[in-house]
From Swiss-Prot:
PANTHER family: PENICILLIN-BINDING PROTEIN ACTIVATOR LPOA. A lipid is attached at residue 26 (S-diacylglycerol cysteine). One of its GO terms (cellular component) is periplasmic side of cell outer membrane. CDD domains: PBP1_YraM_LppC_lipoprotein-like (cd06339). Disulfide bonds: none annotated. This is Penicillin-binding protein activator LpoA. It is found in: Cell outer membrane. Belongs to the LpoA family. The gene is lpoA. Interacts with PBP1a. Keywords: Cell outer membrane, Cell shape, Lipoprotein, Membrane, Palmitate, Peptidoglycan synthesis, Signal. One of its GO terms (biological process) is peptidoglycan biosynthetic process. Residues 1-25 form the signal peptide.
Amino acid sequence: MLSSTFVRSKAGLVPVILAALILAACTGDAPQTPPPVNIQDEASANSDYYLQQLQQSSDDNKADWQLLAIRALLREAKVPQAAEQLSTLPANLSDTQRQEQQLLAAELLIAQKNTPAAADILAKLEATQLSANQKVRYYQAQIAANQDKATLPLIRAFIAQEPLLTDKAHQDNIDGTWQSLSQLTPQELNTMVINADENVLQGWLDLLRVYQDNKQDPELLKAGIKDWQTRYPQNPAAKNLPTALTQISNFSQASTAKIALLLPLSGPAQVFADAIQQGFTAAQNGSAVTASVPVTPNVTESSPTDTAAVVSDDTPATLPAPVTPPVVTNAQVKIYDTNTQPLAALLAQAQQDGATLVVGPLLKPEVEQLSATPSTLNILALNQPEASNNSPNICYFALSPEDEARDAAHHLWEQQKRMPLLLVPRGALGERIAKAFADEWQKQGGQTVLQQNFGSTTELKQSINSGAGIRLTGTPVSVSNVAAAPASVTIAGLTIPAPPIDAPVVSTSSSGNIDAVYIIATPSELTLIKPMIDMATSSRSKPALFASSRSYQAGAGPDYRLEMEGIQFSDIPLMAGSNPALLQQASAKYANDYSLVRLYAMGIDAWALANHFSEMRQIPGFQVKGVTGDLTASSDCVITRKLPWLQYRQGMVVPLA
């Protein structure tokens, strides 16, 4: 039997338990308290979650949830929805909310490709008032808004975000800083003004100067970088060099003791191969060196009417002589005819013969085979495949009209032209040239390029006799998706896909916005094309005219030069007057056939590139000043040529400053 004390105690507990149960039930029926909101922190949930919280929250928290939803929508590439939410934010925001709103507005504008407006907003934000997470987004927005051109704000943004990054992002940031610095021109670097307390930036600028002063000598560059690391031990790049400079630490000079020269010494291409071989041999023996005596120029390029600066087509304007001297060595060269055996067999034979470097092949079908032909030999191909592969032992050196068109795209862009029309011959050659130009044009930020084809000289004569001019119209050049598509934007580690490309708008009027015409024509064709353009345009709307070296041949007298008044054209430095003695020697050898003279020059530069193969392959920015152009290598070792440009003025040919 239970004691009366126990019964009373148990009975006393009943009301307490009942009250607790009732309280628990009431608590369960009450609405849940929403989680705390911190708009300055990470926003890792999806937009649906934040939008749901926005609907369920009280008025005090609605703006916070809406700001988080906008961030999530941008992360999910739902740009229109993000813009709609941003436009409906309440006007009475707190200072913290206002900062987040401005940061989101800048990120939205970047996603919409309106980087100038984004940069204006970012310039008004005070970074010191932002949280660590917001600072990362702020600096990455600064980088995205200034990515079109290397500027001081862009470089400062890279430097400022470095302490906020972790793991692999550190190296990516260092590489991005270096890439931006490398795009600065010498003039921009020399005129740059920085604050006295910007020690990290000063270190970066000194590293750039070390690189620019010594990049032509790998050993000096190695020593310079090591000294820089000692002087700037706290700089992020002192601990982790940019990837491009890390390669220099591992630089090794490849042997050129035995060179295999692969050319089509028989068949239809023999005449071209012979010219290249003779140039290669002349450079090897030093005969091209004796002809390379610098001639002191007596021109004043800034004066368009200075007759001391002008010469006829037979005596091109004197330009500075190449600063990269041809290499004279005791290398052995053995020549192989690519028309006698398959390419794979020739490469195997060359390796068996002890070759350490291959120069060639020349013809594009054989160059296309290189990537599928296993060989450990270093190879300097004398042409370029349609799609180059980044093979660590192959470089590509082409003297092609496509290569010249790519240089023309840069020249027209530097001349502030933005609406070019290409006049190219009908057929495969014209299509290749147009595509090469348009690809390079769009890489620089240019828009649609228009193309117009022309037929034979007979057709042109018929048109001009009928009084028909050439109207400034054309069809859009079809370019590769990689070149044509705008890049996506990454902000705070979030990649926003590029917007769809609108269909190009084609000018249909001769009084449209075309401001430049690039013409690929022979002298006889250009003689007809230029007056036909003049017939169809007024003097006020006349575009600038540019031509390729195809229009510059021997035998063009003063009448032709007068007719070509104002046209700018490009050619290799040898033809532009960099070395008159060598030009005279080569012209005599080939009876003034300028096409063969250019191939002879290609052979000279092929020798120079062969002897600097390791530098071109391993040192970014290494340059050979050759007789076919200023030669540099892309990341996949495609040799690019920067050409001199000349202009017809008052019956003379003058170099452009």
